[in-house]
Amino acid sequence: VFSVPGMPCIYYGDEAGVEGCADPFCRRTYPWGREDQDMLARYKAMAAMRNGHPVLKTGECAYIAPCSAVLGVIRKNENGKDAFGKKAENACAVTLINRSAREVVVYLTSADVSGAQTLVSDDGQIFTARSGAFSVKIKGLQGMTMFAK
């Protein structure tokens, strides 16, 4: 949600851990004072990450599927311009989401990420290209965003 083009849209209560129900009872009430604090902190961190990296707001966008379990979003500003042709710092961000319950390893080429040789994830992991490729391990039902350095 925070890596794709457009304004992030969060369904009522997702940030607090509210679970849905079947129609017509689509949503439970908001748990005022009982929010899932870990979930709330994660949403706040994702919003701060997007606000701190303009490429996540206005960079060119491409979708990838490096394996059947993983969906990826690549956002790039190249040649000093963003997707709208406005002046922007060159940057590249990659978000990978593992839809599988098991850990997977995916491979990205340096060309996928604007020729970068190093990627730094939102949680501080550092990935270095070896022979022009990155090997990225993603835990089951998890995601990560990495920035080219």
Q: Where is each model-derived feature located?
A:
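Solvent-exposed beta-hairpin/edge-strand motifs
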Residues: 110-124
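Aromatic/acidic polysaccharide-binding cleft in carbohydrate-active enzymes
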Residues: 2-37
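Hydrophobic alpha-helix feature that most strongly marks membrane-spanning transmembrane helices
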Residues: 2, 6, 21, 47, ...
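Hydrophobic, well-ordered secondary-structure elements that form the walls
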Residues: 1, 13, 46, 94, ...
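C-terminal beta-strand-rich structural cap/linker in extracellular carbohydrate-active enzymes
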Residues: 129-149
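Carbohydrate-binding surface patches
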Residues: 64-113
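Aromatic- and carboxylate-lined catalytic core of secreted/periplasmic carbohydrate-active enzymes
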Residues: 30-67, 71
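Active-site proximal loops enriched in glycine and acidic residues that flank catalytic Cys/His/Asp
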Residues: 12-14, 20, 34, 75, ...
